[in-house]
Amino acid sequence: MTELARLKFYATQPHSCSYLPDEQATTLFLDPSQPMDVHVYADLSEMGFRRSGDHLYRPHCQNCNACVPARIPVAQFLPDRNQKRILKRNADLTVMPAKPRFTEEYFDLYQRYIEERHADGDMFPPSRDQFSTFLVRDLPFSRFYEFRADGRLVAVAVTDLLPNGLSAVYTFYEPAEERRSLGRFAILWQIGEALRQELEAVYLGYWIKNCKKMNYKTQYRPIELLINQRWVTLN
């Protein structure tokens, strides 16, 4: 473990919660002057931190603990029947890694995704600056995994490669390809990729029981939840 006690953190003022509209949220950030070291990142991921752009953060709310960090221990994962169907349905896709960068092809897909799937969220309306600030960072451990069907871009899984696992930062995909269940397929692919790289887990971010948009995360079993600073298996 890195010497985490030497790191500095800053908490925001309370602000509106993006997931639970009746709640106020506080966010804890790693000091942005601290270099984005992959080993620090890996250690903080074990403590429930996530990356957004150049920042590592986790919820630090005074009166709410609804945001529960979740990860999939990939060596124990077994796909259910529906997940096997999703894998079969997308067997024609090719997946290639790319360096994070801005292209009109990426942004056009991202724009369609946000407008169709998240028009009620705080990322709407999508913009080029938002895309670049959120996803296009010059970090040696970050990848854009491109999913293509006959050369046509249908999904991008923004993924961080850590010593202890893969962190699923964000995935955006073609909303017209609903039958493929591309968001779920991207996670299944990341599980397979973590196994191929002999890594321990895929970090999915936060699961919130009362947020319907988060329900899909517990469909991958077993899943581990960080509760009282311990990873607990939910079978």
UniProtKB/Swiss-Prot annotation:
GO BP annotations of the record are: ubiquitin-dependent protein catabolic process via the N-end rule pathway
Short name of one Pfam family: ATE_N
Q: A GO molecular-function term, please?
A: arginyl-tRNA--protein transferase activity
Q: What class of enzyme is it?
A: transferase
Q: Name one GO cellular component term.
A: cytoplasm
According to its UniProt record, the EC number is 2.3.2.29
Where in or outside the cell is it found? Cytoplasm
According to its UniProt record, where is this protein mainly located? cytoplasm
Catalytic function, reaction form: N-terminal L-glutamyl-[protein] + L-leucyl-tRNA(Leu) = N-terminal L-leucyl-L-glutamyl-[protein] + tRNA(Leu) + H(+); N-terminal L-aspartyl-[protein] + L-leucyl-tRNA(Leu) = N-terminal L-leucyl-L-aspartyl-[protein] + tRNA(Leu) + H(+)
Q: Which UniProt keywords apply?
A: Acyltransferase, Cytoplasm, Transferase
Q: Write down the SUPFAM superfamilies for this protein, in alphabetical order.
A: Acyl-CoA N-acyltransferases (Nat)
Q: Does the keyword Acyltransferase apply?
A: yes
Function as written in the Swiss-Prot or TrEMBL entry: Functions in the N-end rule pathway of protein degradation where it conjugates Leu from its aminoacyl-tRNA to the N-termini of proteins containing an N-terminal aspartate or glutamate.
Family membership, please give it. Answer: Belongs to the R-transferase family. Bpt subfamily.
What PANTHER family does this protein's entry cite? Answer: ARGININE-TRNA-PROTEIN TRANSFERASE 1, ARGINYL-TRNA--PROTEIN TRANSFERASE 1
Q: Tell me what this protein is called.
A: Aspartate/glutamate leucyltransferase
**Lineage of this protein's species?**
Bacteria, Pseudomonadati, Pseudomonadota, Gammaproteobacteria, Pseudomonadales
Q: Which gene encodes it?
A: bpt
